């Protein structure tokens, strides 16, 4: 039982948003604009969310640089990048609504770079047919967070004038970690957690929760992710009864720093390649031309000369292979290093110095110039960077309704947006789609959470017993006199995931990973943290480990089950895509403490969307049965068009008669 001396701070809200990155802030703004009393829970300091690390830009088909761009082209690019495993409805909504979300952000005060005629500037990025990324130098994520924070402050000022308190309708709880979602039957009733500084417990009673907690990268040693990314939202959703989808798909960004060891994994923005940077191996060869897969061969240049012409004449030349989707580039770099053509630090060279004048590099890529000079003593205006793959993004996440963001499974009142949700990106995310994804689906999740609250006949109640259990679970590591060290456990977990569930996967290694994860589960159950509750990083990690472990098990199980290679999942023993597997989503749920894995059919794309693709392209992804359906659809459409034309001609009467008919009359 909970000690009577255990103090719990209690709050009542309509909507609780867990996560203060782009998705969380946009969801909170929407819930507050809908009139709901909203709490924002930030694991770190407010304004320090991992979104600030997103550098390149936000993808939106505004057509400011190339007027040929539109939502249909963006949709096609997103589906191609995800190898057609995307939830098509999410990809459609994203492509259609991203421009409006970017323009909206500008009305909030965002200061985007401009074209010469004053429009929002857009840059090239891997997998995007046209320049599409709205950007602020190479610090776009930072500007996005600054702008959304500014909007929240303006709402708080409005509340101060109307209600007498800045926190009356929207409040930020920073340096706060949520450890459990609390239920009333199958409905969300609240969230329980603690203040990281004091260790004091906090309880939010609320009928709706929006998860916006980001990714899982801290389960890997080499990662671009910040310390907060321990899979909290994924695990909270699982324990509450929601399902996770596509957890086998992890994106290893092709360009992370590899030297010095203390900064290995820190992101090197794709903007370097978008602005002309090229990849070379230790022999000086521009190697990406050797790695263009058949499914992309029509869109990418075959020679360096054509690739270089594309930057100034994209309408008459094909794209450089350095701008292939990230999964392709990461595998290529991995192969070069594995075959002995890597740099001394175990990466490859990324060269922008020979491609642009020094002043232009400093203007376009100020953060990269500062990062390499400060961390590696490398001047990128004079010498190439050493880069290699780094765990960057999880495509899998909470399975949600595409339109509302409501979680699937056995729980009601739970919503998810951003990286913690799954489906939008399929098997691989295109660069730039993340920031616009945050805005599109953050807005939708926040708005629909507010609608859900409005439609409730009565608010759910938090049971005393569930709070007591949450307290006991949180205190357990502190109450063990002996046990496993949390830092050792994290290192062991990272070794398992990095060595056995990394870029290249094999059946025996995945089976070994699951066996080792089972052993780690027993050890994590005995984790011990010395000291008290006041700012105790060992205790914090001990609690995070439970989340990291269950999410890692989902990834390993799904990776073992999917016997093909697609996007962010590469099986050396099944090296090609299998059209039959494209029709399958792998869905994880919890039965007690056991991860259950089920197969679920991928939703069929609507006719008007699948008709955006050529048959020759679809033949690379679809089964023969699906292609037959497509052919029948095309035939039916042609017949319908012919019938409609005949009907129109008949309705037009004599005016539609040809010259011969007129002569006969």
Explain the meaning of each model-derived region:
Residues 3-6, 10-13, 22, 30, ...:
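Glycine- and aromatic-enriched mobile tails/lids
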Residues 10-13, 198-208, 410-411:
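Core beta-strand elements of the Rossmann-like FAD/NAD(P) dinucleotide-binding domain
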Residues 36-42, 246:
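Short beta-strand "acidic-cap" motif of Rossmann-like dinucleotide-binding folds
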Residues 44-77, 251-254, 262-266:
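Conserved N-terminal glycine-rich FAD pyrophosphate-binding loop of Rossmann-like flavoproteins
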Residues 86-99, 133-150, 173, 223-231, ...:
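Short beta-strand to alpha-helix junction loop
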Residues 101-200, 212, 256-260, 342-343:
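Conserved redox-cofactor binding core of oxidoreductases
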Residues 208-266, 431-448:
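Glycine-rich loop(s) and the adjacent beta-strand/alpha-helix scaffold that form part
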Residues 242-374, 448-454:
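An anion/pyrophosphate-binding glycine-rich loop and adjacent beta-alpha core
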